[in-house]
Amino acid sequence: MWMACSSVGVSARSMLLQRASFRACNSHRGLATHLARASASSSALSNKPPLKTPPQSVPQVASDDLPMISMDDRKVAIGWDTRTWSRFHNIWLRDHCRCPECFHPITKQRLVNTFEIPPDITPSQAEPTADGLRVSWPSSQPHVSLYPWSWLQRNSYDPALKQRETQLEKIIWSSKIQASPPTVTYEEAMAEDERGLYKWLSHVDHFGMCFISGVPPTPEATEELSKRIGFIRETQYGKFWDFTSDLAKGDTAYTTLALGAHTDNTYYTDPCGLQLFHLLSHTEGSGGSTLLVDGFYVASILKELHPDAYSVLARTPVPAHAAGEPSEFYQPYPASGYPVLTHDPVTGELIQVRWNNDDRSVMNNLDPYQVEAWYAAIRTWHKLLTSADSEYWVQLGPGTAVIVDNHRVLHGRSAFTGRRRMCGAYIGVDEYRSKLAVLREKFNPNPDNASGPETTRSIWSPAL
């Protein structure tokens, strides 16, 4: 879900967003308060031998409030009340048994052989208990399974009773965010207890970017800051980069030219997730302001005001390439590329913006009737991207690094003179998401996610 941040202001044009179910928030102070309330807990794995189940905390239901159960040869139906029922296929229930014989309590991997389950399997009994639905399977494959009520409600698919788990709420922002941009200090990010790291990555998850102040103006300190999140991803530019405008690489970034708002790696099948960069020095010149644009904010306006253009950008693949080095040639697979806007196929949520007009290849994949509509759509997209309402300009200096979600926030710069020294790194989206998920378990655990005094990850975790 997207939220419009009231503290960053909204123009008359973007007020339309509020009618499109965007809720206002009071800047990111609410997030800071939320983080301050989070309690720490150990995340160490249990040392118990395999197949010995760690204590699993299963919420109980009073016997008077037990759901009603009905079953036939295909499904088990659960009546939560007189009006709400969930139906689960028998084979689905058997496949999702999480006893130690069917689901490893330590590795959290499936042990049951899905393909040995008879397709027409039918329980011999299904009964409600305080701990959950207890299912006894037929004598041909004798087994007993227990499913907590909260787990069944969360995973109900016929019908879906709860909104599918998505990423944390995204706070979309305009240029007005310059009044109070999300920021953490270097000391917070590097603190051993990882609370500051959780605050940092939570800002990135909410806003798609975050500044880090007080960074020692050295490549070594910046590299350690990058590694705080996860492995640095190596590309044709190396692992950790430290560069100037000397065209050491065949890319416009290695010049003094202006760069329009873009995401990196559109020529990759899997663009890098995060990009951190730090201006170490700028001597004998001027210019070089950093440009940041929230692609989700711009996409929300495009969808509200120009739904046809939005649809074109969501369905039309755009080929791309990186061909500035004679010994290298990059293009995504398939070569037809990917749309500018990518959505979760289940929830419909916008999950990625992929846009760099400079790296775009020949658009020879358009049908004749699509050509004019596509150019009209990217013209509208460009107009919104480059509006004063969308563009957040900031002059970085030594000691202040910025990290952006390369799947959401576009970046660029103004032209400059003199000599600039910049360093930074890419971090994979999966490494970033893994670190954030682990820190969330540690500092803001879901009641269904932890079990026992050791707070090991529960087999009933919503993420599993």
Question: What label would you give each PLM region?
Answer:
Residues W2-E192:
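Motif-centric detector for short Cys/His coordination patterns
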Residues E169-M209, G214-L464:
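Active-site environment of non-heme Fe oxygenases that use a 2-His-1-carboxylate facial triad
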